Amino acid sequence: TELLAKHYGWEAHFEDVIDNPYLNDFYNHMERWSFNLQIYFLKSRFEQLLKIKNNDGSIVQDRTIYEDAHIFAPNLKSMGLMNLRDFKNYQELFDLMESQIQGPNLLIYLRSNIPNLVNKIHKRGRDYENSISIEYLSRLNERYEAWTSTYNKGKLITIDVDELDFVENKKDFEIIVEKLDGELKEIGAA
């Protein structure tokens, strides 16, 4: 997100992981804090979308409101980490919010295998992420694949990043930019 914002001159909107009062608690006791965390992210992303709606410039967001509703919350429910009552409450709130927003012009899905994801998580160095299980990551990956295969809110580009290190390697970043340039021209955003 940061690299794309800098390259294209876009305004960046990041996932709130620093000020999030539930994140550390969630990773220590997922079942207890899953609903609170998902509601916090839903509120945070909706606030971002309201700001974006009133902005004339180009924006890049590191995670969409749709990912929580179609991937993270359902994953927590299916793993028994969010009960059905809380999940339904969450979904109804998401549905209400979704009726007030517009999908992104372009969604970029960075596809990655589990070993690569684990490596990136460790590189980030966030202590609270040390307890993330392989099962949890695998289920998220499966849900991302299913969701992106039916995504219909706008244009979607999938980039396999298993062999790319676009943060450390400028040539790898240029590969991504080249792919994006073509898509941006196609949607009239270049």
Set out the residue ranges of the language-model regions.
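A glycine- and Lys/Arg-enriched "phosphate-lid" helix/loop adjacent to the NTP-binding pocket
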Residues: 70-145
